[in-house]
Amino acid sequence: MTVDSALYSAFELIRDNGSRYPYLAPVYTEYKGLFSCENDSEAEEFDPMLNSEVRGFVDETLAYVNNPDAIDIELLGENKLRLNVSDEYADFASQNDIVEYLDFFWLKNAFIVDYIAEHLAENSYIHGTITTYDGYTRHLGGAGMALSMNFYDETDGRGIPAAQMDFKTARNAVYFRNYENSDMDTMHFYTYSNGEVRNPFVDPKDGLCKASKSDLLMYSDELGCAEIALAAYGLYSSDSFDTEAVLSTAKRGVNAVYCEGTEVCFTEAEATLSHLYQNDGLSYSAKHVS
């Protein structure tokens, strides 16, 4: 099959990062059903964390999607690729009404904003900022144009504008969060009546959605949004927050901002945080970590 060069490049990046995220499409289908629910009883029908039948399906599916011998995209050059699916997986898919083998899901807009930004740059448009509702930002810079980005921290079920960071040069960012931020988020989150949240950050190891922090900002001067997202996804979709892994990622050019209590921690030595939240009995401070 011959595809657009942008899609081919996306699969090249996925391959080079050793990622299996797009192959999780059948698992994402369950989460899409969950996110579209209007009440808890409906949501539980799709939730692998609460429904043992769904959990069993997810476990079986992961045995295939995490196995390159069961499913893999073969890149043939000249924008040609082939989707290889084993007979065993094809039979499993047929028996379980699986109709989608591939889905970029939450990562999709990362590739889209990168494509738009690169296309604009090729045509000498270097001013302005491209953002998406689900956390991707390409700040093009140009003529010293600055971008102020708010960083939030969830406290008692509400987002606190903990600090502000100014991007004074061209810079790309990915913002992970574990809560709905606008009406557009309704298809990417579900919040149970007890406050538990289901998000789009599915761990490919067990098929469960996770969030190691309520908020995590990752950014880079050199890498695009898709590269940042792939580098940081495992840091966020995790049972616990690994500070050492975050610092290691920062050494590779992808810096982080996150909260530890009321400390807004940042890894870039030259970064400046302002407008630290001081209200409602909360007093946020900034802390450089290295």
Region roles according to the model:
Residues 1-290:
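Mature catalytic core of soluble alpha/beta enzymes
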